[in-house]
Amino acid sequence: MAAGKFASLPRNMPVNHQFPLASSMDLLSSRSPLAEHRPDAYQDVSIHGTLPRKKKGPPPIRSCDDFSHMGTLPHSKSPRQNSPVTQDGIQESPWQDRHGETFTFRDPHLLDPTVEYVKFSKERHIMDRTPEKLKKELEEELLLSSEDLRSHAWYHGRIPRQVSENLVQRDGDFLVRDSLSSPGNFVLTCQWKNLAQHFKINRTVLRLSEAYSRVQYQFEMESFDSIPGLVRCYVGNRRPISQQSGAIIFQPINRTVPLRCLEEHYGTSPGQAREGSLTKGRPDVAKRLSLTMGGVQAREQNLPRGNLLRNKEKSGSQPACLDHMQDRRALSLKAHQSESYLPIGCKLPPQSSGVDTSPCPNSPVFRTGSEPALSPAVVRRVSSDARAGEALRGSDSQLCPKPPPKPCKVPFLKVPSSPSAWLNSEANYCELNPAFATGCGRGAKLPSCAQGSHTELLTAKQNEAPGPRNSGVNYLILDDDDRERPWEPAAAQMEKGQWDKGEFVTPLLETVSSFRPNEFESKFLPPENKPLETAMLKRAKELFTNNDPKVIAQHVLSMDCRVARILGVSEEMRRNMGVSSGLELITLPHGHQLRLDIIERHNTMAIGIAVDILGCTGTLEDRAATLSKIIQVAVELKDSMGDLYSFSALMKALEMPQITRLEKTWTALRHQYTQTAILYEKQLKPFSKLLHEGRESTCVPPNNVSVPLLMPLVTLMERQAVTFEGTDMWEKNDQSCEIMLNHLATARFMAEAADSYRMNAERILAGFQPDEEMNEICKTEFQMRLLWGSKGAQVNQTERYEKFNQILTALSRKLEPPPVKQAEL
């Protein structure tokens, strides 16, 4: 624009003197401008290329006196000191005008101010001509989520302190800005009693665990999870921000331009923002962007991590703006000269005589996105111990080795280390080829291709020769020796005759439940019975009340070990399962039916315990005694038996909403069985919480556990098939992902240590003689027939649980009716 308007004017003037701007009349006059015009008698230069006009009155000292506009004829004023670095640098000095405005100019060791000013004028001219675009961008910011700070107009981003003070004019006005002296923090600026005040918003990090933390914000008293919530509280309640100042905020000062414009207007680094701040209502005086490498580097280093505006310019294969071409070219040149600017994530291959390296292109546009392999001769190597976000230190051609990387400070989830049982070959899973394993005995050898090199293996695969693997993953192939191979059956299993002649038998996929209520022969129940028969409920309650809690726990443990296939597993069952224990089977895909059976028994037991409490037709004291007995059985299951599976079922029954709402019953328990109530509150409930958070290894010795906690694992694996009263409590926790990882790691340990659980159960049940009647009421089939009847026991699990949940709610309200207001609602 300037080149077209002033192309006819001379441009070969000397530049070693400082000249003022002259008007268009001076160009036509033959008189010397020194006699009539003073250097301080002109206003600011217009940013649209028009010529300056003469100003009447006392002449202020302005920044436009220090440089000349492109295309104007300069007139000499006085000799100028030559700088050793540049011929036309500007003297750096702040000046005060009559309004107290502070103007700070650039470093003298920069480029020509004329070129920079024209560039700034063009950008400002383009920005001024697109108000609709800025308005639309501002509306998009304000339509973000209410918890996003950018969606609130009273947030002004990184504006200087002086600018924020000028924006608040009346008592109660406020805005929130970024702290320039403490990046990452926020400051609330307000006016109270005709005085601008600044309050730093205290930021506190609450570390919940090693991997999770929560950030809270506060002034003096109450803390909030977000800054918008803090502002809403103080504005809505007219609460003083501090007791000392008594400042109250109620009138927000809203921004009228997007945050991007404010950021470009004032700069991003604290030092630059203070030097180039716009003061006292002069939005047309903007900080000039530096074209030097130091300015570009400073802006890049001081950007916040979440700044998406700057990331747009750094990504992709094309430059974001052609105006910054020289900046990027200088940055590219610096990057090639200094090792500290090596791109993260790639290595420069060492130069050798055998590899020709092509020179870098002369184009200033360079790629900052993905880097394709330009030459097949250059081999890209990736270090195995590389960390995400680790900067490279020098090229590979250096003689000195790189120092070891610093440990990562970001917390991450750690999987518990596997026990020594994982090193045993019997505990490892292997990939079996039925066609190959069928013809191989104990002494059979692998084909020669399997013992040779990878090339021979590929050759055999092309010839369709059978191999020991089906997948395309390459495994290490061991030489022929006396050690056991992972694809061969274990020696101990071979001696027991699990597989005849070493042949592989495909595991049996079970599709029918092991619980058959209609085929169950009971001493108490007729062939066909109705649900919740009163006589059967009383008989089961008498057996439960008259037996010792430890005896009841032993019967429950014995039945759990058979259902989970920890004890009483025959050779035929092992052959059908493909593994030796049900604890390992529930982690495998074909263990679907066993997982359903485990869920069935757990939920049926919990419902049965709840019915034992709610179905009592006796007095309040009888219900309190039943509660006490159940808590004692839970203690025995936890301490003596090590049966965490049934322990969780009893705790689930006690924590049902239909049970916890019985305030009179729990009060009677505390009065009559104080020690039992304390034991439940202080020991059982915290222990149950630790179990469901996957931290049982910290409070339970492994050698004391006979049946581990199974429900979190089987519930996760069968979530689409079975649901009971929504998700579990641990899944609603803030640390649910870490808890799930703990449960999955525990499942791996269960599969590895299945033999240890079996030996613990055999040791605990040694010499145990079960009672026939007590043993029957502990069976799942009896409980299903008692609760749902002979016909209802065949209905789908989900439907049965939903209907019985309504029955439990009705029984609970019958024992202790809700208040009248709740009943009316």
From Swiss-Prot:
SMART domains: RasGEF, SH2. GO terms for cellular component: cytoplasm; focal adhesion; membrane. The modification Omega-N-methylarginine is found at residue 442. Residues 40-106 are annotated as: Disordered. Residues 154-253 form the SH2 domain. The record marks 748 as: Required for interaction with NEDD9. InterPro entries: Ras_GEF_dom_sf, RASGEF_cat_dom, RASGEF_cat_dom_sf, SH2, SH2-Ras-GEF_adapter, SH2_dom_sf, SH2_SHEP1/BCAR3/NSP1. GO terms for biological process: endothelin receptor signaling pathway; epidermal growth factor receptor signaling pathway; insulin receptor signaling pathway; lens morphogenesis in camera-type eye; positive regulation of cell population proliferation; positive regulation of GTPase activity; positive regulation of MAPK cascade; response to xenobiotic stimulus. Ubiquitously expressed. Found in several cancer cell lines, but not in nonmalignant breast tissue. It is found in: Cytoplasm; Cell junction, Focal adhesion. Phosphorylated on tyrosine residues. Acts as an adapter protein downstream of several growth factor receptors to promote cell proliferation, migration, and redistribution of actin fibers. Specifically involved in INS/insulin signaling pathway by mediating MAPK1/ERK2-MAPK3/ERK1 activation and DNA synthesis. Promotes insulin-mediated membrane ruffling. In response to vasoconstrictor peptide EDN1, involved in the activation of RAP1 downstream of PTK2B via interaction with phosphorylated BCAR1. Part of a complex comprised of PTPRA, BCAR1, BCAR3 (via SH2 domain) and SRC; the formation of the complex is dependent on integrin mediated-tyrosine phosphorylation of PTPRA. Within the complex, interacts (via SH2 domain) with PTPRA (when phosphorylated on 'Tyr-798'). Interacts (via Ras-GEF domain) with BCAR1. Interacts (via Ras-GEF domain) with NEDD9. Interacts with PTK2/FAK1. Interacts with PTPN1. Interacts (via SH2 domain) with EGFR (when tyrosine-phosphorylated). This is Breast cancer anti-estrogen resistance protein 3. It comes from Homo sapiens. The gene is BCAR3.
